[in-house]
């Protein structure tokens, strides 16, 4: 296929641990450009379907995804298969709370995790604005939901995540480099916090992704590798995305300590995610 159609992209939907689906070496690979990361999709959805009180015991599901992430060139995938046949829509899968507001907060965190995690992205139509009903082949999407600020906010978040993804190399150039991804402070006592760094190809190209998957606000000191400041690019709890934080709170510059090991302190609202850009 590559020889006769050099501009075509081939993607394998393969659910086992069969090796070398995308390996570039001739003769060692099936020759696909990408492979669906079904393991990641399964583990992540299972985590977000877990009630908040039980999430600390399940956080290892997200951490474990790192173990196989760089064995292939993956695409993180949320396809139509996950929103049909009584599996519920993405927003209705969220177990953060019973109200739509809380489910939307949980879904916003999921979106930041999807865009922040190494690998390409797919999101089936309707998920980007929080369609409530399952996908039905004979029905239109629930576009009327966009009259609500909750669904407008979800759509705006996806729009902003896409903008960061296509304009900032940190989150798309180093997908296959294990050394460009690093978890931070996995010894969190609460079991509800997760953070990781994404590095670009150039010195100083660093983003920090921080998550609070719990039902209460937390303040956390994260160790970081560089001295300097970090600007919050996205806070999923912003009113812009249907949350409750004012814009000033979402555009603060967080300073690091003056000596190594450097650290920054973040206030993390319940069911929230933040993206911070390192500033020299």
Name what the model sees in each region:
Residues 1-136, 166, 172, 176, ...:
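Conserved alpha/beta catalytic core and glycan-binding cleft of carbohydrate-active enzymes
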Residues 97-101, 145-152:
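A short acidic, glycine-rich active-site loop
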Residues 104, 151, 220, 261-262:
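A generic helix-loop boundary/linker signal
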Residues 105-109, 149-157:
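Generic recognition of stable, solvent-exposed alpha-helical segments in well-folded globular domains
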Residues 135-145:
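Active-site His/acidic residue clusters
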Residues 146, 153-154, 161-163, 222-255:
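C-terminal accessory region downstream of the catalytic core in glycan-modifying enzymes
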Residues 148-153, 162, 166-172, 275-280:
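Beta-rich accessory regions
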Residues 247-280:
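C-terminal beta-strand-rich structural cap/linker in extracellular carbohydrate-active enzymes
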